[in-house]
């Protein structure tokens, strides 16, 4: 946002230089991105001076040129050839000396014109850029002092443009008065002489006659709406002072009425809109929602299709303006306008934001409305603009100001405890200093008591709700640099946690990256509609954002899975179909059974999530096959195994059906603490994101995983000296028997001799009865003390088969 230094000083009298102002603004949280010195005329007419024509004779080889000699204040006269018809001896003129650059690139050089040398140029108004006349040279007053720089003689203004990187919560500073208010508080606190001048609008008066009425049918979109009717205006170019102010901040002057609305916008921060009253059909203004599919042509000449959610300013027959965003092509002020309807309103920030985003329109008005304009500045801005219109464009206010304001907006109040504020600040700054700073920031003291107060927050400070917000305001003005660091730090030293969480996390990330997974980082904010149909993560448990910038980012995520599906959908839409990703991040939830006023109502913890979808590219050597549920389970098993954890030792249950069509959830044995959930993502969730290929996902609770890692201490063993023996076993089982149960029983029976169990084939079909299946199992046996004999092996295998027969009804094949 651009602020003109000269314009700023209209409201704040102080002796600070532009550089000092920029430094002060940065210190109070309005970070200055750039400071640019500008001149009324580019270059400041450097090299142009006042000179006196001492001699003027006709050119010997021309019927219209003159050879002049000028006194420039130097001992010798300067010869210049001039073609102006009005040049004469005795005149005081403006001379561009050799080396001067006029305009963009017109450089004055020593030249020879028809055989006569010339050492400069006597200038006309248009050549200097101060007018449009080229009828002759510019003749100055006789009192002009020879040698005076043109910049000083003409009184050309210099200015400094301060560019502020405004954060989303500081819309109160999106104007010259807004910046002046903040700067005033800073200067006053630091005992720097200053005075705040807010333009007086007490001269505004309503008139006689009948004003254009206002009807608001969408009060939720326009909580406050006013309209002022001004008749008999004369549309013309704005006065020079107004044009200069707008040009200084990069705005193009249009006409006096439109320029006044832009001026007030950047002066106060309140957007205004001027309508040609003659184009308001039916003689009334209606604030309503658009009809679904309604067509509307905006000022840029583009026909737009409206949504039923768009708020419109209309007349009795048709729409005239996208409320708070952009005007219509046929309703604006033109040269033929005589009567004006001036709108000043407070529009719902969410409504404006959605309309602005939906139609891809970003304007100065929408910038302020969607961040939250000052609802109590509506009347002041209307009066200020009306007085300026009457002063500059003429006309009179007709009738009463029309207003729709069904529910009065009151200032927020905050209860303050001064001792608690000083604890927040980290320094005893004094109760009187707290009150002095708040007073300079225009806080009103509703109630004062010993050690505290109740204050009314200025209506333009839309981000201040709580005591901690007020503390931030106090700190901005007091100065973070004035909070000294203590000479000694008191802290308890804790032994580092073993194993260190960050090392475990890095080890997991390295493992996944080595196996082809790509790490992603998603926004913790997401949209609430993702949770509207979930039972596992119900929408009621979402932590909601108080002032969301967008409905797409209005809650904190409860799970990483939905964000991961967003990433997969994004990549698939860009022809990337083979996807393996993982993410480490926080998830949040809220207990809807509580009042939400304490931290106990909220929960935050971190998770790992893995995602697989698609099929890797084939090579001439190998067909990798499609990703599958079991492939993802294998990665999870290997991941846990790295930290000495056996996935088969965990408690298992079915994965939640609203997230997975098939899958398992795991919990720590004994404590039942949830560890992970994994499986094939349910079709309903895939449809939600427009994904048409299978997706396999897992979400792992970081606290539970770290607890598992902490429990299972890794032990190092000597490499075995004696060989392994492998045996296979094919058995017929009921469909209800699962491999995990067989595996547990096998290790219970095999004890120290059984090293590995594997399932290498599952068969159903011909010669297998319905409800039955055949498992082909492999067993790896090893004795660490000796080489196993055939008898040793057969003894173990017999025990295994007997166990399977007794516990699971297995039949040897």
Q: Which residues does each predicted region cover?
A:
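Phosphate-backbone binding interfaces of nucleic-acid-interacting proteins
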Residues: 1-205, 341, 360, 364, ...
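Conserved mixed alpha/beta core segments that line enzyme active sites in large multi-domain catalysts
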Residues: 49-81, 147, 243, 255, ...
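Terminal amphipathic helices with adjacent charged low-complexity linkers/tails
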Residues: 183, 187-217, 393-421, 428, ...
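Glycine/proline-enriched, intrinsically flexible loops and inter-domain linkers
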Residues: 5, 23, 28, 40, ...
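Beta-rich nucleic-acid/ligand-interaction surfaces
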Residues: 40-44, 203-205, 264, 456, ...
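Mobile "lid/hinge" segments at catalytic clefts and subdomain interfaces of large enzymes
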Residues: 114-129, 133-139, 150-160, 164, ...
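A carboxyl-terminal module marker
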Residues: 2, 439-446, 467, 522, ...
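Extended, well-folded interaction surfaces typified by the phenylalanyl-tRNA synthetase beta subunit core
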Residues: 414-582, 727, 780-784, 792-813
């Amino acid at each position: 946002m651009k602020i003109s230094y000269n314009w700023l000083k209209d409201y704040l009298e102080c002796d600070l230089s532009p550089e000092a102002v920029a430094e002060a603004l940065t210190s109070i949280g309005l970070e200055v991105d750039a400071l640019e010195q500008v001149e009324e005329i580019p270059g400041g007419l450097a090299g142009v001076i006042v000179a006196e024509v001492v001699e003027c004779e006709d050119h010997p080889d021309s019927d219209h040129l003159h050879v002049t000699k000028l006194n420039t204040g130097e001992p010798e006269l300067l010869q210049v050839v001039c073609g102006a018809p009005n040049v004469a001896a005795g005149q005081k003129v403006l001379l561009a000396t050799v080396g001067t650059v006029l305009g963009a690139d017109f450089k004055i050089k020593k030249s020879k014109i028809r055989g006569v040398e010339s050492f400069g140029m006597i200038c006309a108004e248009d050549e200097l850029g101060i007018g449009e006349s080229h009828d002759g040279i510019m003749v100055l007053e006789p009192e002009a002092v020879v040698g005076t720089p043109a910049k000083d003689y003409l009184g050309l203004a210099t200015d400094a443009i301060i560019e502020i990187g405004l954060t989303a919560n500081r819309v109160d500073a999106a104007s010259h008065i807004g910046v002046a208010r903040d700067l005033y508080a800073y200067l006053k606190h630091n005992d720097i002489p200053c005075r705040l001048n807010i333009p007086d609008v007490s001269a505004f008066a309503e008139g006689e006659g009948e004003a254009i009425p206002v009807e608001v049918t969408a009060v939720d979109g326009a909580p406050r709406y006013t309209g002022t009717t001004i008749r008999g205006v004369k549309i013309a170019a704005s006065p020079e002072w107004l044009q200069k102010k707008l040009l200084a901040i990069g705005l193009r002057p249009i006409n006096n009425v439109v320029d006044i609305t832009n001026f007030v916008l950047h002066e106060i921060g309140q957007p205004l809109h001027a309508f040609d009253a003659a184009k308001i059909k039916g003689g009334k203004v209606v604030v309503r929602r658009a009809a679904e599919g309604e067509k509307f042509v905006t000022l840029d000449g583009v026909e737009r299709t409206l949504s039923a959610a768009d708020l419109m300013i209309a007349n009795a027959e048709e729409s005239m303006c996208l409320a708070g965003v952009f005007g219509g092509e046929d309703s604006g002020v033109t040269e033929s306008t005589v009567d004006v309807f001036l709108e000043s309103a407070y529009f719902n920030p969410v409504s404006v934001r959605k309309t602005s985003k939906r139609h891809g329109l970003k304007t100065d008005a929408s910038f302020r409305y969607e961040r939250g304009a000052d609802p109590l500045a509506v009347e002041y801005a209307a009066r200020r603009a009306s007085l300026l219109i009457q002063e500059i464009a003429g006309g009179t206010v007709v009738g009463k100001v029309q207003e729709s304001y069904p529910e009065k907006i009151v200032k927020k109040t905050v209860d303050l405890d001064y001792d608690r504020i000083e604890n927040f600040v980290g320094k005893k700054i004094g109760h009187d200093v707290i009150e002095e700073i708040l007073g300079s920031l225009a806080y009103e003291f509703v109630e004062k008591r010993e050690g505290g107060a109740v204050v009314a927050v200025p209506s333009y400070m839309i981000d201040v709700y709580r005591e901690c917000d007020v503390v931030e305001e106090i700190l901005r003005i007091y100065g973070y640099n004035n909070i000294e660091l203590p000479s000694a730090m008191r802290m308890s030293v804790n032994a580092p946690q073993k194993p260190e969480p960050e090392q475990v996390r890095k080890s997991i990330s390295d493992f996944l990256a080595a196996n082809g997974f790509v790490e992603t980082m998603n926004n913790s904010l997401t949209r609430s509609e993702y949770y509207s149909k979930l039972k596992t993560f119900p929408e009621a448990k979402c932590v909601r954002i108080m002032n969301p910038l967008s409905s797409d980012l209005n809650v904190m995520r409860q799970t990483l899975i939905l964000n991961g599906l967003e990433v997969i959908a994004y990549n698939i839409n860009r022809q990337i179909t083979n996807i393996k990703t993982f993410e480490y991040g926080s998830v949040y939830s809220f207990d809807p059974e509580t009042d939400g006023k304490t931290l106990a109502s909220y929960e935050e913890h971190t998770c790992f999530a893995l995602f697989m979808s698609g099929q890797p590219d084939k090579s001439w050597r190998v067909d990798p096959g499609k990703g599958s549920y079991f492939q993802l389970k294998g990665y999870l098993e290997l991941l846990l195994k790295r930290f000495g954890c056996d996935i088969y030792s965990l408690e298992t249950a079915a994965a939640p059906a609203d997230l997975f069509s098939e899958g398992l959830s795991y919990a720590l044995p004994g404590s039942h603490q949830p560890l992970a959930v994994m499986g094939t993502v349910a079709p309903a969730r895939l449809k939600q994101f427009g994904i048409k290929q299978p997706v396999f996902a897992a979400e792992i609770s970081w606290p539970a995983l770290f607890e598992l890692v902490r429990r299972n201490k890794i032990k190092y063993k000597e490499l075995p000296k004696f060989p392994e023996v492998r045996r296979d076993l094919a058995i017929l089982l009921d469909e209800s028997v699962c491999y995990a149960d067989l595996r547990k029983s096998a290790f219970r029976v095999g004890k120290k001799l059984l090293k590995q169990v594997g399932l290498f084939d599952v068969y159903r079909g011909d010669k297998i009865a319905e409800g039955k299946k055949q498992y082909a199992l492999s067993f790896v046996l090893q004795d660490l003390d000796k080489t196993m004999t055939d008898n040793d092996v057969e003894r173990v295998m017999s025990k295994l088969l007997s166990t399977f027969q007794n516990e699971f009804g297995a039949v040897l094949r």
